[in-house]
Swiss-Prot record:
This is Imidazoleglycerol-phosphate dehydratase. Coiled coil: none annotated. GO terms for cellular component: cytoplasm. Pathway: Amino-acid biosynthesis; L-histidine biosynthesis; L-histidine from 5-phospho-alpha-D-ribose 1-diphosphate: step 6/9. It comes from Bradyrhizobium diazoefficiens (strain JCM 10833 / BCRC 13528 / IAM 13628 / NBRC 14792 / USDA 110). It is found in: Cytoplasm.
Length: 197
């Protein structure tokens, strides 16, 4: 099974993330940030990646460090669990509706970290959660998972729906991209024979 656990401790946060890429979408999330927990639960459920996240952060300041550092740790865990990436599908893209909102998420598990994020939120906050932190999380995840990730909201009016369509879109794209391709026969999905660089 493709699993990994990452522990990350700084003066600002103490985080432990465990993933099982071949799971069923079971999640156990506790970051102290209700909306963020909801997004990570959606990510696990719709990617079918088992996900445990335990995070303690400096929430008396704001949600920034906890959100970003969780993205770092989760990205590192996914990268570690993928190992050599032999046999994976590698590429995937989805259009994800959430009521009036439609977002497009496309991923390449390339070993080359890139984020293109074209998402606008009509409000600065979703509850107590700063909407600018959605991009911070995606940036941290993409850089540390070493994936090329394009996220774009084509239209939408509700900030909650926009964020949810982005996380669900990533979930479904990840689900497809990390899947083992039975036609690949364990090969690295690159003409170079390796991924990254």
């Amino acid at each position: 099974m493709r699993t990994a656990t990452i522990k990350r401790k700084t003066k600002e946060t103490d985080i432990e993330v465990t993933v099982n890429l071949d799971g069923t979408g079971v999640s156990n999330i506790a970051t102290g940030i209700g909306f963020f927990d909801h997004m990570l639960d959606l990510l696990a459920r719709h990617s079918r990646i088992d996900l445990t996240v335990k995070a303690v952060g400096d929430l008396h300041i704001d949600h920034h460090h906890t959100t970003e550092d969780t993205g770092i740790a989760l990205g590192q865990a996914v990268k570690q669990a993928l190992g050599t990436m032999a046999g994976i599908t590698r590429y995937a893209g989805v259009h994800m509706p959430m009521d009036e909102t439609l977002s497009r998420v496309v991923i390449d598990i390339s070993g080359r970290p890139v984020l293109v994020f074209k998402v606008d939120f009509p409000r600065d906050k979703i509850g107590e959660f700063d909407t600018e932190l959605v991009r911070e999380w995606f940036q941290a995840f993409a850089m540390n998972a070493s994936v090329t990730l394009h996220v774009e909201t084509l239209y939408g009016d509700n900030s909650h729906h926009i964020a949810e369509s982005c996380f669900k879109g990533l979930a479904r794209a990840l689900r497809a991209a990390v899947a083992i391709d039975p036609k690949a026969a364990g090969e690295i999905p690159s003409t170079k024979g390796s991924l990254g660089g």
